[in-house]
Amino acid sequence: MEVLKWVVTIVVLLFVAIFAFGFLSGDPSRNPGRGSGQ
């Protein structure tokens, strides 16, 4: 069942990457007053 494990790992990594990318890209848009990044 290595294929299933690989598929799950890839899906999780893609989901985390998309979530992180969307969060970083939408962080200043969501919190224009705070600006915790910079």
Swiss-Prot record:
Biological role: One of the components of the core complex of photosystem II (PSII), required for its stability and/or assembly. PSII is a light-driven water:plastoquinone oxidoreductase that uses light energy to abstract electrons from H(2)O, generating O(2) and a proton gradient subsequently used for ATP formation. It consists of a core antenna complex that captures photons, and an electron transfer chain that converts photonic excitation into a charge separation.
Family stated for the protein in its record: Belongs to the PsbI family.
Subcellular compartments: Cell inner membrane
Pfam families in alphabetical order: PsbI
Protein name: Photosystem II reaction center protein I
Subunit structure: PSII is composed of 1 copy each of membrane proteins PsbA, PsbB, PsbC, PsbD, PsbE, PsbF, PsbH, PsbI, PsbJ, PsbK, PsbL, PsbM, PsbT, PsbX, Psb30/Ycf12, peripheral proteins PsbO, CyanoQ (PsbQ), PsbU, PsbV and a large number of cofactors. It forms dimeric complexes.
Gene: psbI
Principal place of residence: membrane
Transmembrane segment boundaries: 6-26
One of the GO biological process terms: photosynthesis
GO cellular component, one term: plasma membrane
Membrane-protein topology: Single-pass membrane protein
